[in-house]
């Protein structure tokens, strides 16, 4: 059964990633709830999930702010991912069911055949397959939890790539994911970590280019619940 906050999470998430790309904004929870016609309780759940995904933070006075997604933060997030994600995926490789890996591999093969004719959420689902679903099998829950705040990188791609940012001429990451999944199916933890590091190294450069491009467009925000805020001194 879908929970109440899930009904409005995606559109709120889309607007919050745009806030993050534009800078630091104060997010008024009451006005946001009114804007979407839901209760404060429902909207608070939405914002708590956005916080877990690294989109917003709450200050000592319980005020919500977007976390700017600029080149510096992209580099910080990828530094964290490059340290932790290869380890987490290599650990997951030892326990994830073979059937799960075969299904992920099958979806990648289908996507390669169809690219660029994919549904709007097609790329996002493939990203989630590896970086969330497969990674969730890591037996170290602290690694999984630490990586949650880096999901704003995936959220950026989810809401902009193939929509406001044109899809690249060549497939964006399918072969890289296939090499990681193949190593996982062989239960070769060292190869999983090696392929994951290579993938993240390439992904960092692509995301940096896309973030620079999006921020350079300077599209003004017109959201009744978001007000540009100065950085704390």
Label every model-predicted segment.
Residues 1-84, 226-233:
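Short linear motifs at protein or domain termini
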Residues 3, 121, 125, 168-172:
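Short helix-capping and inter-helix turn/linker motifs at the boundaries of alpha-helical repeat units
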Residues 15, 19, 114, 135-137, ...:
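Hydrophobic side-chain positions on well-ordered alpha-helices
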Residues 29, 140-141, 187-188:
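Short loop-to-helix capping motifs
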Residues 160-233:
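C-terminal all-alpha effector/ligand-binding and dimerization domain
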């Amino acid at each position: 059964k879908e929970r109440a906050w899930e009904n409005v999470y995606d559109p709120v998430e889309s607007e919050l990633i745009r806030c993050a790309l534009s800078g630091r904004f104060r997010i008024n929870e009451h006005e946001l709830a009114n804007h979407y016609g839901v209760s404060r309780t429902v909207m608070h759940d939405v914002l708590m999930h956005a916080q877990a995904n690294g989109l917003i933070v709450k200050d000592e006075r319980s005020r919500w702010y977007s976390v700017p997604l600029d080149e510096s933060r992209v580099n910080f997030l990828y530094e964290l991912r490059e340290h932790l994600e290869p380890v987490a995926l290599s650990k997951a490789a030892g326990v994830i069911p073979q059937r799960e890996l075969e299904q992920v591999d099958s979806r990648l093969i289908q996507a390669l055949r169809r690219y660029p004719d994919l549904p709007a959420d097609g790329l996002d689902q493939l990203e989630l397959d590896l970086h969330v679903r497969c990674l969730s099998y890591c037996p170290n829950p602290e690694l999984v939890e630490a990586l949650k705040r880096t999901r704003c990188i995936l959220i950026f791609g989810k809401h902009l790539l193939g929509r406001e940012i044109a899809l690249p001429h060549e497939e964006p990451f399918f072969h890289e994911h296939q090499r990681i999944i193949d190593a996982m199916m062989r239960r070769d933890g060292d190869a999983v970590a090696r392929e994951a590091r290579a993938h993240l190294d390439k992904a960092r450069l692509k995301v940096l280019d896309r973030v620079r491009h999006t921020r350079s467009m300077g599209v003004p925000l017109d959201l009744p619940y978001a007000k540009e805020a100065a950085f704390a001194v």
